[in-house]
């Protein structure tokens, strides 16, 4: 298969991973990142197309990134999502049910595009658990226009949340764990809850205190405490044991560790995957969204 350039666009830092899907993971041959000019991309929303276009042109050129097949992974509040349980049915009927459920859940938009990702399948009951997502057509049109302006060929667009879900599937040690994946994305934190290796819930919020400060460590501990309380009220029999950090610095880990341990959580970096091959010196935790996007669903 020809190389794909996976491009993660959400906050000020842009990540790219060049590679191909494999039968059980992905092969990444190059990875790069850059910081965008301030104010051209905020929480996945393009706010200054001219500056963003110029910065991405320079990023692709400086890192010699292939431009003929770009798999975009986008995040932010423009993408709405829900977990749904659906019985066996035709694809046409399934999409109709998804549309109804997303609309009834407050995701009513003028011109929606709906999609879903299979999370698990119960062979006995023939019920599928899916991650359904909705985005307005104008958002996708905006990314298509950006691709044309920068000069790359858009191969696919996927929901940011899909990348860590796919990455977790490739790591045997996480399959029976109940943990929180904490992804640092500039001044934004995404917290994804996995119960026995299955994605269950996520939140995304801004940090009010500077990263690496003692105050940010306290703030993050408060966010985790709220997530633990939410999980407890769901009456799950599985206790949250660990918090895995991705996109974090040594300072982030240092200031967060005391608060996490006070909550009874083990602190780890998100582990590498045995089936995601990365360039020497690159950790999966540092390129999780861009690399995870290369893993086939």
Identify the role of each PLM range.
Residues 1-297:
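Hydrophobic/aromatic-enriched cytosolic interaction surfaces used to assemble or bind macromolecules
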